[in-house]
């Protein structure tokens, strides 16, 4: 797949539920889901043709929406995240977040992100959620701009079910988006259930480097401590001093 993370997420709609592995070549900006950069395209194609790659399975979440009219649940899925957000910009949405059939917290907010480990570096990350390594089999719950004392991110076990209820008294109705693409309107009184899927998404991998390297590279993280920076500054100052001395001589 040639493109950025959005293009890769669109391609995932075609491969989800199949045994076909997905490999992304980054033509966008961050490209967290991509395995190769554009300058390495020819080498990536050669390795694919030679079947010189490994397959990594990524957790996907299944989503079920119960609407207040009592009809059949609407089903969906997400590789990155399923997000319940307010439908009206000027008003908050009031929700109850629950885990395994038990309410955990109720608050007004802009929304709630329910993410996989893969999605922890996307919308959930920008909302203050933690980064989870891809092999972590868990579901992340991150409130968006919640007006509450207890509205912290939650890391939920793989066998748990997360629910987000849009309260009947909510000033705004809601909208559910899966991976920022597939959208379902949520009238007041709707319930969204999110749980880990039994069908993971398969990604082709060319590199054996740990996820840590990808994290540092994609986010351009400063990995040199102050001691090393201080030593580097001192070294440059000493070099300038020696150069000045040579010029004076």
What do these predicted regions represent?
Residues 97, 119, 176:
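Short aromatic-centered micro-motifs
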Residues 4, 26, 82, 180:
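A residue-level signal for conserved active-site and pocket-lining positions in enzyme catalytic cores
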Residues 102, 106-150:
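Gly/Ser/Thr-rich active-site loops/lids in small-molecule metabolic enzymes
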Residues 1-18, 42, 46:
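N-terminal glycine-/serine-/threonine-rich phosphate-binding loop
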Residues 4-7, 30, 118-120:
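Short glycine-rich anion-binding loops that position phosphate/pyrophosphate groups of nucleotides
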Residues 29-111:
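Catalytic core of DAGKc-family lipid kinases
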Residues 19-21, 140:
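Proline-centered loop/turn at the N-terminus of a beta-strand
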Residues 84, 100-103, 151-249:
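ATP/nucleoside-binding phosphotransfer catalytic cores, i.e., glycine-rich phosphate-binding loops
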């Amino acid at each position: 797949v040639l493109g950025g993370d959005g293009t890769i997420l669109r391609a995932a709609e075609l491969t989800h539920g199949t045994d076909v592995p997905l490999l992304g070549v980054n033509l966008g900006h961050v490209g967290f889901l991509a395995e190769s950069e554009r300058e390495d395209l020819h080498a990536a194609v050669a390795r694919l043709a030679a079947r010189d790659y490994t397959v990594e399975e990524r957790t996907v979440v299944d989503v079920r929406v119960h609407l207040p009219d009592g009809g059949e649940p609407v089903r969906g899925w997400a590789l990155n995240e399923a997000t319940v957000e307010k439908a009206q910009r000027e008003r908050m949405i009031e929700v109850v977040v629950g885990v395994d059939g038990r309410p955990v917290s109720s608050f007004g907010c802009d929304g709630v992100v329910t993410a996989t480990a893969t999605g922890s570096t996307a919308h959930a990350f920008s909302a203050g959620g933690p980064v989870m390594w891809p092999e972590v089999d868990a579901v992340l719950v991150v409130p968006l701009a919640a007006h509450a004392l207890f509205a912290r991110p939650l890391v939920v076990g793989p066998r748990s079910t997360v629910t987000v209820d849009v309260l009947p008294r909510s000033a705004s109705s809601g909208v559910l988006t899966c991976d920022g693409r597939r959208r379902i309107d949520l009238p007041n009184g709707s319930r969204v259930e999110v749980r880990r899927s039994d069908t993971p998404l398969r990604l082709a991998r060319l590199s054996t480097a740990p996820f840590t390297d990808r994290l540092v590279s994609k986010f351009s993280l400063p990995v040199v401590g102050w001691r090393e920076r201080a030593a580097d500054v001192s070294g440059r100052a000493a070099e300038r001093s020696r150069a000045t001395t040579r010029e004076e001589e």
